[in-house]
Amino acid sequence: KIMTFSNLCNEIFWKSTTDYHVTDSVDAPMNNPYELKTIEYYLYLKNWIDAVQWHFEDIIRDPQIDPVEALALKRRIDKSNQDRTDLVELIDSYFLDKYKEVKPLSDATINTESPAWAIDRLSILALKIYHMQQEVERTDTTEEHRAQCQAKLNILLEQRKDLSTAIEQLLADIEAGRKYMKVYKQMKMYNDPALNPVLYAKK
């Protein structure tokens, strides 16, 4: 099997997802096995952040959660969202650098999303697939529940296959100059004191 970029992503995302679930703790330290500042390192980190955030969202949905804990958790979710966005931008900068010598064709078009935002969705899919697989493998549920989850799992696997193909097509188009990358800085307003009214009112 040729190691395409999407294959690399899926492999690393799956490793990170399964590594996270060894402890299944939002406070567990991350042991990133890849060399610092490599694209592999950032892909592993990306999925780890997504896995932690997935479980933050589970915890905060608990109706019995203590309000003080909920507020502290909300702040951690905000920080996690910011980290996630920063990392997506960093992954896009990898592609911008990789394809900087490519001259777009005169009729080149722009894609609706940058490569890294598509890769972001691929990372979330790894988590969805993992959790759906857990449901399929449960022995304390009905056969009907397992069958429903298996049907959902099949759709998620098909979605991952299609999204991986679309990412490969996009990267091939960028490389050939048929498409060009344009990255807009994501303005995450809730963390920026200059942009969030509640924060700048406190100055």
Indicate where each model-derived feature is located.
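Anionic, Ser/Thr-rich low-complexity intrinsically disordered regions
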Residues: I2-K203
